Amino acid sequence: MAERCIEILAIPEGKECLILDIGCGSGLSGSVLTDHGYEWIGVDISPSMLEVAKENEVEGDLINLDVGQGFSFRAGSFDYAISVSALQWLCIAEKSKYNVNKRLKNFFVSLYKCLNIGARCAFQFYPANPEQINLITKSALENGFTGGVVVDFPHSTKKKSIIYFYKLDSLKNLLKMLWMLFLKMRLMMMKKMKKLMLLEKEEN
């Protein structure tokens, strides 16, 4: 599943990057990132799972964190983020004091801040129902991301969903770059046309 997330992220070959592994658990997905040569930091709410990861001697740094309360990383720390089989827990209010919408907002607002410009995310999870997908997608779109949903094996009882997101400012930067390229090409064409008109004048 981590391989599928990496595939969706489409990381350029040879690119040095730092990846945030959300809900890293025992470090299985982190080990896949290591095999691909990526540096990573893993966060998980379960101290016991992080102990297992340490026993497995994973190469990433590990942090005990409830992502529903948000991240506290420095702005622009990560180039990519993945999550394998964890995001659905944000949609479950295990304690009466938990507010699902607030926890999702904390998650996406703080994630947006700690991602670099142009960052991409791929989150694989098992939704209990369509409402969970809608909740997660709605919160992401309201807090600076754009993206979509990929459903692998939709007719299987074990179907899984992968949501991919882009920082919205990366889309803005892309549109800005395309607009600047358009203006540059337009200017070049105008200069070329002007030159042709002058040549025609001289010939006449």
PLM-predicted stretches and their roles:
Residues 83-86:
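A short beta-strand submotif of the Rossmann-like class I SAM-dependent methyltransferase core
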Residues 1-17, 32:
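Conserved alpha-helix/loop element of class I SAM-dependent methyltransferases that forms part
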Residues 99-117:
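A short glycine-rich, Lys/Arg-flanked "PGG" loop and its adjoining helix->strand segment in the class I
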Residues 17-71:
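Class I SAM-dependent methyltransferase SAM/SAH-binding core
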Residues 118-125:
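Conserved beta-strand signature within the Rossmann-like core of class I S-adenosyl-L-methionine
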Residues 127-192:
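Class I S-adenosyl-L-methionine
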Residues 9, 13, 57, 114-117:
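A generic alpha-to-beta junction signature in SAM-dependent methyltransferases
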Residues 68-81:
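A short acidic, Gly/Pro-enriched loop at the edge of an enzyme's catalytic core
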